[in-house]
């Protein structure tokens, strides 16, 4: 019987294999290997997340019937509001935060990630950010239209953008959302200074933050 615990060889090897795949960068088009990894991840989730397994069985998508990653059932967003969906005990979570509650503010979904998942997400996000946001510069001043993780430890975008700030930002990079709201003074001062010096800055954040400022 296969051991799917967090410390098992199966999980450690799967994390290592996915990380190796990510490190092959965006020009890697090994569809066969991608499918193998996706099926292994599905196997892990199928055997360790009871609500997900029940959902798959009801949809006629038992593990034995899945051959390609396209056949793997996607989890409805409502499931994160009703269940704790993790492949590991939540006390071993490295990150824990809530979804935005867009569909129902009174019932926010909860997401937990172990250290292996955090490492994989950081590697993938770093690769995409370098490719599509900072392809021609190592670091840049970044103004973040979000609260910091210290101010909002349960918000996923705050956690993710802190990684962007530390990996791609200069020391002058800053968060614009404070306990008092949007720091308009810092925002405008930074824009004027950037124009005067001819130095670009990156404005990154949620759409809502920009809407509030433009209004």
Model feature map: region roles:
Residues 33-39, 53-78:
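Short secondary-structure junction/hinge motifs that connect adjacent elements
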Residues 3-26, 59, 69-215:
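Active-site phosphate/ATP/adenylate-binding loop shared across adenylate-forming ligases
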């Amino acid at each position: 019987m296969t051991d799917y615990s967090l410390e098992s060889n199966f999980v450690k090897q799967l994390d290592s294999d996915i990380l190796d795949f990510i490190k092959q960068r965006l020009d890697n088009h090994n569809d066969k290997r991608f499918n193998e990894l996706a099926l292994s991840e599905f196997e892990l989730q199928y055997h360790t997340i009871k609500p997900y397994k029940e959902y798959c069985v009801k949809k006629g998508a038992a593990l034995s019937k899945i051959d390609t990653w396209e056949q793997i059932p996607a989890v409805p967003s409502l499931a994160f509001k009703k269940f704790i969906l993790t492949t590991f005990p939540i006390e071993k979570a490295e990150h824990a935060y809530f979804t935005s509650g867009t569909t129902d503010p009174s019932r926010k979904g909860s997401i937990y990630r172990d250290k292996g998942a955090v490492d994989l997400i950081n590697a993938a996000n770093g690769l995409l950010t370098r490719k599509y946001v900072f392809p021609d510069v190592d670091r840049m001043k970044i103004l973040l239209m979000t609260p910091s993780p210290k101010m909002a430890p349960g918000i996923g975008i705050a956690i993710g953008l802190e990684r962007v700030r530390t990996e791609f930002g200069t020391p002058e990079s800053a968060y614009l959302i404070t306990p008092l709201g949007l720091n308009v003074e810092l925002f405008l001062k930074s824009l004027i200074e950037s124009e005067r010096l001819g130095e670009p800055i990156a404005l990154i954040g949620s759409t809502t933050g920009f809407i509030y400022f433009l209004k």
